[in-house]
From Swiss-Prot:
Residues 1-22 form the signal peptide. The gene is CG-3. Residues 196-354, 406-567 form the Cupin type-1 domain. Seed storage protein. Accumulates during seed development and is hydrolyzed after germination to provide a carbon and nitrogen source for the developing seedling. This is Beta-conglycinin alpha subunit 1. It is found in: Vacuole, Aleurone grain; Endoplasmic reticulum; Protein storage vacuole. Pfam families: Cupin_1. One of its GO terms (molecular function) is nutrient reservoir activity. Residues 137-149, 169-184 have a biased composition (Acidic residues). Residues 65-195 are annotated as: Disordered. The lineage of its organism: Eukaryota, Viridiplantae, Streptophyta, Embryophyta, Tracheophyta. Belongs to the 7S seed storage protein family. Glycans are attached at N261, N517. SUPFAM superfamilies: RmlC-like cupins.
Length: 605
């Protein structure tokens, strides 16, 4: 009988258990409406990864509620999953699901399957097209939408959108490139390819402030291996405004200073005395290595510009300037000595030395020190008058002094006519230049004048444009490859052309024929390296023409034309040195006839 009742008893127990579970679930759902709502919102997520993450957050919500009930620990309210945001309560920190990381109990899945990828593309592309259609032609909003889409959806942009965007970017880049190239493109091309041209951008600024600047030119041999013999020479440019002073300093290099514009009081300090000179445009003076000097611009209106040829004595092509003064741009070289050395040298406490020479007392802050901003400072008129009392003017009568300044225009020009004047001082005439094996030249040319083709026998000439503009043409030989067929290859000439303006520098190697055409009133200054016994050979003109000195028998063999034709051609030019740059009209009989000078001269045309 018990066996007959056992199944009925078991069935009753199962029924009671199911009813209890049903009531328990209903009660739990009633007590946890947020969890239920969270689960319902998860059903709307089609992406499997986001669906799993949503369920994980709902489970965390349940755990947080249970822990809160057990320990009575307040927890932040979970963010609703629907798009609308609830109003932010005071003191409640806003959380962003995309920005704030949440604990995810599942590892981030690997790249999606192809089916999911295709399904996602079908969903997202129409959305982007719809946004683009709503924005119309507003480019800024269009770019913002595209960037937002790319951040939200890590899928490739549709092919047609990629092509359109790439095409727009290419067009913009092409327009920008064309506008940049159109601006002085031809001039930049010549400057970059011409190894003998040094534009203003080839200078490096050493010191600069509102009163002036000091710049040094790039090393010559860094520009071209053809200028290897100039590796020991550097060019400095100094500019200063009126009523200014370059603080005392010395360098480990011999200086040859030339005044290009303005007036300067240049003082050289010796062990027992000092020499001060009032220098004008065209004056030059050698400053031996290690000599302390300073420069004043005493003029009230005109700026001072000078060029310095520096010949280092310690390292080839490298030199240093040592300033006595301590400034924000340069420490005094005295500060390099130890404290006890300074105290013993001046028999004074270091604190006093520091205060007097370096403008800093021990314990002073950086902002409290009284330092000059740079090595070029302003000077009062009273101080200028005091410094000018002992200044001597350069002599225009003598150029043979061993230590006094000389003027490049002190003698008559070596070449002169109505179109230009050429002044020059050679090492044979000046001991200062003889020690350095240098000649100095200064040239004035009228607009439209042409300095006839010529070459220097051994001097390398550094030409500095001071005022005006010019076109210059230099002729060299193309480099030939060292091969067995070299004997069969003809030697070809190469023309280096440049448009020069103020502050440009051009180097003329020895033996390279050169011609200068002034496109405006022109003034330039030249330094000749290896100047002793240099000879300037002209290739045209009635005087000093090297071609006219060649015997007729050799001319017959050297040129296609006869010796009589060569002589006649050379005599056509009655002027010398400076001529009109506009060629004269030829007679009808000479038209079409090949000229006899077809070698080097042909490279100038």
């Amino acid at each position: 009988m018990m066996r007959a009742r056992f199944p009925l008893l078991l069935l009753g127990l199962v029924f009671l258990a199911s009813v209890s579970v049903s009531f328990g679930i209903a009660y739990w759902e009633k007590e946890n409406p947020k969890h239920n709502k969270c689960l319902q919102s998860c059903n709307s997520e089609r992406d499997s990864y986001r669906n799993q993450a949503c369920h994980a957050r709902c489970n965390l919500l349940k755990v947080e509620k249970e822990e809160c009930e057990e320990g009575e620990i307040p927890r932040p309210r979970p963010r609703p999953q629907h798009p609308e945001r609830e109003p932010q309560q005071p003191g409640e920190k806003e959380e962003d699901e995309d920005e704030q990381p949440r604990p995810i109990p599942f590892p981030r899945p690997q790249p999606r399957q192809e089916e999911e990828h295709e399904q996602r593309e079908e969903q997202e592309w129409p959305r982007k097209e719809e946004k683009r259609g709503e924005k119309g032609s507003e480019e800024e909003d269009e770019d913002e939408d595209e960037e937002q889409d790319e951040r939200q959806f890590p899928f490739p942009r549709p092919p047609h959108q990629k092509e359109e965007r790439k095409q727009e970017e290419d067009e913009d880049e092409e327009q920008q490139r064309e506008s940049e190239e159109s601006e002085d493109s031809e001039l930049r091309r010549h400057k970059n390819k011409n190894p003998f041209l040094f534009g203003s951008n080839r200078f490096e600024t050493l010191f600069k402030n509102q009163y002036g600047r000091i710049r040094v030119l790039q090393r010559f041999n860094q520009r071209s291996p053809q200028l290897q013999n100039l590796r020991d020479y550097r060019i400095l440019e100094f500019n200063s405004k009126p009523n200014t002073l370059l603080l005392p300093n010395h360098a480990d290099a011999d200086y040859l200073i030339v005044i290009l514009n303005g007036t300067a009081i240049l003082s050289l300090v010796n062990n027992d005395d000092r020499d001060s000179y009032r220098l004008q445009s065209g004056d030059a003076l050698r400053v031996p290595s290690g000599t302390t000097y300073y420069v004043v611009n005493p003029d009230n209106n005109e700026n001072l510009r000078l060029i310095t040829l520096a010949i280092p004595v310690n390292k080839p092509g490298r030199f240093e300037s040592f300033f006595l003064s301590s400034t924000e741009a340069q420490q005094s070289y005295l500060q390099g000595f130890s404290r006890n050395i300074l105290e013993a040298s001046y028999d004074t406490k270091f604190e006093e030395i520091n205060k007097v020479l370096f403008s800093r007392e021990e314990g002073q802050q950086q902002g409290e020190q009284r330092l000059q901003e740079s090595v070029i400072v302003e000077i009062s008129k009273e101080q200028i008058r005091a410094l000018s009392k002992r200044a001597k003017s350069s002599s225009r009568k003598t150029i043979s002094s061993e230590d006094k300044p000389f003027n490049l225009r002190s003698r008559d020009p070596i070449y002169s006519n109505k179109l230009g004047k050429f002044f020059e001082i050679t090492p044979e005439k000046n001991p200062q230049l003889r020690d350095l094996d240098i000649f100095l030249s200064i040239v004035d040319m009228n607009e439209g004048a042409l300095l006839l083709p010529h070459f220097n026998s051994k001097a390398i000439v550094i030409l500095v444009i001071n005022e005006g503009d010019a076109n210059i043409e230099l002729v060299g030989l193309k480099e030939q490859q060292q091969e067995q067929q070299q004997e069969e290859q003809p030697l070809e000439v190469r023309k280096y052309r440049a448009e020069l303006s103020e502050q440009d520098i051009f180097v003329i190697p020895a033996g390279y024929p050169v011609v200068v055409n002034a496109t405006s009133n022109l003034n330039f200054f030249a330094i000749g390296i290896n100047a002793e016994n240099n000879q300037r050979n002209f290739l045209a003109g009635s005087q000093d023409n090297v071609i006219s000195q060649i015997p007729s028998q050799v001319q017959e063999l050297a040129f296609p034309g006869s010796a009589q034709a060569v002589e006649k051609l050379l005599k056509n030019q009655r002027e010398s040195y400076f001529v009109d740059a506009q060629p004269k009209k030829k007679e009808e009989g000479n038209k079409g006839r090949k000229g006899p000078l077809s070698s080097i001269l042909r490279a100038f045309y």
